[in-house]
């Protein structure tokens, strides 16, 4: 399993590629839908006209040729944690634990391609996540589609993840 994780680290892509992938996802007509649905494995997805904030992350990685559904499932299996192929990759704490395992945490300045984990309403608030774009905005889905309509500081930043260069 360690070999799998190390290999994934080498194949991860660049922050600029992630920013570009996220920007390509702009679609204000994506309907917010957090309901667990059966999806194909590996690399399945709910219908592209539906999604939540985590689906922005998963879809951007998929554009770069990465399957977070499979990677997070395998990561959780390697840790002896319960798994659900339809939903694990669509939960912020699971994404965060996986990104931290790849040494992606960063608490410095923001750059395009950074993955921002917010706490809406303050430090104990609701989880939300998005990807920093070149224009200083963040691609996310908070219920108004997959759009870049917020600045990073609009919400309480909990963690920042950056792909290794």
Segments (PLM) and residue ranges:
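N-terminal hydrophobic targeting signals that begin at the initiator methionine
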Residues: 1-2
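...with weaker cross-activation on analogous glycine-rich loops/strands in unrelated enzymes
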Residues: 19, 77-146
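Short regulatory "switch" loops immediately downstream of catalytic or recognition motifs
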Residues: 67, 119, 163
